[in-house]
Design a protein with these regions (language model features):
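Long, charge-rich, low-complexity alpha-helical segments
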Residues: 1-9, 55-140, 167
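Acidic, low-complexity/disordered tracts enriched in E/D and polar residues
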Residues: 1-68, 129-132
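Canonical Radical SAM [4Fe-4S] cluster-binding loop centered on the CxxxCxxC motif
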Residues: 131-168, 179, 371
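Radical SAM/AdoMet-radical enzyme domain recognition
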Residues: 137, 155, 166-187, 194-306
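C-terminal accessory region of radical SAM enzymes
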Residues: 310-341, 366-393
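Short, basic/aromatic recognition patches
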Residues: 338-352
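Short, small/polar residue-rich loop motifs at catalytic or cofactor-binding pockets
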Residues: 352-356, 374
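Short, acidic, Ser/Thr-enriched surface-loop or helix-capping motifs
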Residues: 361-362
Length: 393
């Protein structure tokens, strides 16, 4: 995610900040651009605004007020009047500054992959350096169960004695919303093995949250099942590819079908694990992924000895115009067993965003800084949010 610091600032006195809160806006179906905006007003009066859960803007107090009015669709003349009174500047100056802010946000909405720094005069802030009251994203492992036939030791099921119920997961989603977390990703194990996945997506949708699913894609090959997830509000998905299985490619075709039928620009990414068996075909697999309509690619290696070939594969993905996704958790599977994670973790530095930009919730509600980082910060169901967030250190 891009993380930016907005330089917008009215030249008047500093007014009393807005009350802390969390606000969202989703464009209506008739709008030509399918977009969502979220604004979290921090206790300091500064704010965090996300555009489609991908571009993150760190806003100063006055820019936060502009974002608040932009999301609430306040008429521009009323915005100018309020800003003029609060910051003791002329109404004309306030109107001009708000119009400039609105133009920049509209450009981010309407122009895919626009660099806000280069084109919109935003200032970039170093990732993960801002003090936040909550992360940008919550990764929820609904279950550590895997499809029949998967090796039992592939997931860390021994450390999780139970799974939360549907009602309990809804409480977790509601707590995330109350904390101001705009984005939830359901992972596992295999999240589609939970019969309540669509119901949980719908609860998040009702709260205005952006949702994603990371899955092996087997069940999504059934276009009717995928349609239930899309109807429930699914915004994006990452398919963990099993190249030797036809269902993997069928699931991508299923997304392409509904994207065309529904005229829905759902964002699809794919994860590909390089193994000794597929290393020689990796470029051909990447080409096939690119042709399927996938918008981004996540790559990993099952063996450290493959790292040089992995870098070459990343270069090939760039040539195929497939942006790389780095920070989404890859579900535990036969290709990504917990044993591989534990081996890779030895001597490895914790990802910079873990415990800051995102948190990871296990099937029993325990909160970790990130997948595979076995430091329990608390339990999302049992503990207060403030206690969990403070425990991250």
């Amino acid at each position: 995610m891009r993380r930016l610091l907005d330089r917008f600032s009215l030249k008047g006195e500093r007014a009393k900040p807005l009350e802390p809160g969390f606000y969202s806006y989703m464009a209506p179906p008739s709008h030509p651009f399918n977009y969502r905006l979220h604004l979290r007003v921090e206790p300091s009066g500064d704010g965090l605004m996300t555009v489609n859960a991908s571009t993150v803007l760190h806003l100063n107090q006055t820019a936060t007020e502009c974002a608040y009015h932009f999301i609430r669709l306040t008429p521009p003349d009323q915005v100018a009047e309020q800003l003029s009174k609060r910051y003791r500047v002329s109404k004309g100056q306030a109107a001009e500054d708000y119009a400039d802010f609105a133009r920049k946000i509209q450009a981010l909405i309407e122009t895919p992959d626009l660099d806000p720094v280069t084109y919109l005069d935003f200032e970039r802030t170093a990732p993960f350096t801002k003090q936040l009251s909550a992360p940008y994203r919550l990764d929820i492992a609904l279950t550590y169960k895997l499809p029949t036939g998967s090796p039992r030791g592939a997931t860390p099921h021994k450390r999780v004695a139970k799974e939360l119920s549907t009602g309990q997961w809804k409480q977790v989603i509601e707590k995330a919303h109350a904390a101001g977390i705009p984005h939830i990703v359901f992972t596992g194990g295999e999240p589609t093995l939970r019969a309540d996945l669509a119901e949980l997506l719908m609860r998040a949708e009702d709260l205005g949250l952006v949702t994603g699913v990371i899955t092996d894609g087997i069940k999504l090959a059934d276009t009717r099942y995928l349609k239930t997830l899309l109807d429930a509000g699914l915004d994006h998905a990452m398919i963990v590819l099993q190249p030797s299985k036809a269902q993997t490619w069928d699931s991508l075709a299923s997304f392409a079908y509904w994207r065309e039928v529904l005229n829905d620009d759902i964002f699809i990414a794919a994860h590909l694990t390089m193994t000794k068996q597929n290393a020689k075909q990796i470029n051909a697999l990447i080409d096939r992924i690119a042709e399927s309509g996938v918008r981004a690619l996540s790559l990993s290696a099952a063996d450290a000895a493959l790292e040089p070939k992995l870098q070459a594969a990343r270069d090939h993905a760039a040539m195929a115009d497939l942006p790389l996704v780095w920070d989404l958790p890859v579900p535990y599977t036969a290709l990504n067993p917990v044993s591989l994670e534990l081996k890779a973790a030895k001597g490895r530095k914790q990802p910079d965003g873990a415990g800051k930009a995102w948190l990871y919730v296990e099937p029993d509600g325990d909160v970790l800084p990130g997948q595979g980082i076995n430091k329990v910060l608390g339990n999302m169901l049992m503990d207060e949010w403030g206690k969990i967030w403070k425990s991250k250190g």
